[in-house]
Design a protein with these regions (language model features):
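Alpha-helix-loop-beta-strand connector modules within alpha/beta enzyme cores
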Residues: 197-213, 232-242
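Distinct, well-ordered alpha-helical segments
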Residues: 161-165, 228-238
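N-terminal hydrophobic targeting/anchoring segments and the immediately downstream early-domain regions
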Residues: 23-198, 252-363
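Substrate-binding cleft of carbohydrate-active enzyme catalytic domains
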Residues: 207-221, 227-228, 261-267, 342
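Short, catalytically relevant binding-site loops at active-site mouths
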Residues: 226-227, 247-249, 278-281
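Bacterial N-terminal signal peptides
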Residues: 11-21
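Bacterial N-terminal signal peptides that target proteins for export
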Residues: 1-13
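Histidine-centered catalytic micro-motifs
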Residues: 44-51, 224, 242-245
């Protein structure tokens, strides 16, 4: 979501307030009216929605509101209520083993998630529509429909056969990151505890970036290492983005970006979308015992991907019990605001947007 003026930046905050607790922020009637009028003229997008993962849950209906349920943060009723016109819906594949068989599984998983997105769009043409250009997005909003841009988080589905990228582009892919939590065949991750494998992009990664940028796919540096950022800037004839990242000056985490690179990003014409993933906003101070207890709890429900929507309330209550036994610091809207205000001060609103990481741990 590209902000081009401070008034637009303000409008985003006002619109964002709809998703925050009622006590969190207060605005005057005039401010809200100004924000509403501005939003009606703008296409308001979130640059990183992990909602396609939710589409694969048999017990979740994205057409129904699931307010208060941690397993579903984005649905059609709340998009309408919160004035979110749409966003980039992520084809996400978790980084696992890197065997030939695993890469084939990743290829199939990615294509299946892409199919889920298209199935939703085809089944609900009055509510969702695919966008591939800003002009399309504007027309979709004018029709009262939600915008579905397609992004890819982790390029692992392309390792087995990089030419599949052409299929993704033809089916709407317009934003792509090279890597996720762990190093892969294309790039080093910012968070792999083993450290750098390629010292940035691998030879295959450099080739993939060039192949993606040629038809117009924007490269997303989020989750990649600092060395990957530096190489993307050097290699890319067009701007890159960080679809869901934070400010390292506010919280020193490798997933966040330092001020020097923020300024380079801006000079290169790029944009950072500030994310709301608590672990990247503040240090929770979780003890090893807390981490082990939380893992055991999630495993009891079969892992995050297999938790039933009906069990989410019980899971939330159990996590609160863990908070009492093993206190941690939880990120707040003030912490998010600190990151947002910092990057605005460093590079200006024309280089700042919002990528909340909803349905992927954000919020």
């Amino acid at each position: 979501m590209h902000l081009r003026s401070r008034s637009r930046s303000l409008s985003v905050w006002l619109l964002l307030a709809a998703a925050l607790p009622a006590h969190a922020l207060e605005f005057s009637k005039a401010e809200l009216e100004r924000a509403t009028a501005l939003q009606q003229r703008l296409v308001t997008l979130d640059s990183h929605l992990d909602t396609p993962a939710t589409l694969e849950r048999a017990d979740v209906d994205v057409l129904q509101a699931h307010a208060g349920n941690r397993l579903s943060q984005v649905d059609y009723p709340r998009m309408v209520e919160g004035a979110l016109d749409g966003g980039f819906w992520a084809v996400y594949t978790g980084q696992g083993h890197r065997s030939a068989a695993a890469h084939l599984d990743d290829r199939d998983t990615g294509l299946q998630r892409l199919l889920k997105i298209h199935t939703l769009v085809v089944a609900q043409p009055q509510r969702f529509a695919l966008a591939t250009t800003p002009a399309y997005a504007a027309r979709i909003k004018a029709a009262g429909t939600r915008v579905v841009y397609i992004g890819m988080k982790n390029a692992s589905p392309l390792v087995a056969d990089p030419t599949v990228l052409r299929v993704y582009y033809a089916q709407g892919l317009r934003l792509m990151s090279t890597v996720h939590f762990l190093n892969n065949a294309f790039a080093d991750s910012a968070t792999d505890t083993k450290g750098a494998e390629w010292k940035g992009l691998s030879p295959a990664g450099k080739q993939l970036v060039q192949q993606a940028q040629a038809p117009g796919i924007v490269i997303d540096r989020s989750h990649a290492s600092d060395a990957v950022f530096d190489q993307l800037i050097a290699l890319s004839p067009v701007p890159i983005v960080l679809s869901h990242s934070g400010a390292r000056a506010v919280y020193n985490h490798p997933r966040n970006i330092d001020d020097a690179r923020l300024k380079v990003l801006a000079v290169h014409g790029g944009v950072i979308q500030v994310n709301s993933y608590g672990g990247y906003l503040v240090d929770s101070g979780a003890s090893p015992e807390r981490k082990a207890a939380e893992k055991a709890l999630i495993d009891h429900y079969g892992g995050w991907e297999h938790v039933k929507i009906a069990d989410a309330t019980k899971l939330s209550a159990a996590l609160k019990e863990l908070d009492a036994r093993y206190p941690i610091k939880r990120a707040t809207e003030e912490n998010f605001c600190a990151h947002l205000e910092h990057v605005l001060a460093v590079v200006g609103p024309q280089h700042v947007g919002i990528g909340m990481d909803r349905d992927g741990g954000g919020g």
